């Protein structure tokens, strides 16, 4: 019984971690009606809710800390986003940074949008 419990615990942990790793694979939609989150790109990081670094590999896009990997298919994405022209139409305001060390949340109350 103890071995079964340990096995189920490990399988659950692996499943949970796999879900978190995939959390930042995003797809850019052509329509706001297909999107999970409407995003506006700010000119300054001080105006942003989230500073985003575009990863070159899906394996670098971990957790919910602003490391995004853009996928080619909406079926591979955890979140579908649509870029809007006005910050007033956006659910989330982001700023693209040049280093993954600069990525992260500036407004923690919006974190649930990307889970």
Task: Give the ranges of each region predicted by the language model.
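Sec-dependent N-terminal signal peptides
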Residues: 4-16
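Repetitive, compositionally biased segments used for assembly/scaffolding
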Residues: 21-115
């Amino acid at each position: 019984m103890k071995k079964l419990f340990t096995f189920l615990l490990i399988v659950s942990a692996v499943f949970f971690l796999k879900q978190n790793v995939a959390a930042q694979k995003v797809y850019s939609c052509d329509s706001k009606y297909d999107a999970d989150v409407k995003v506006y790109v700010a000119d300054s990081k001080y105006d942003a809710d989230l500073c985003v670094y575009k990863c070159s590999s899906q394996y670098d896009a971990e957790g919910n800390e602003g490391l995004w990997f853009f996928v080619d298919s909406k079926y591979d994405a955890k979140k579908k986003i649509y870029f809007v022209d006005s910050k007033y139409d956006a659910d989330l305001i982001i700023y693209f940074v040049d280093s993954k060390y600069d990525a992260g949340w500036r407004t923690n109350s919006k974190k649930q949008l990307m889970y």
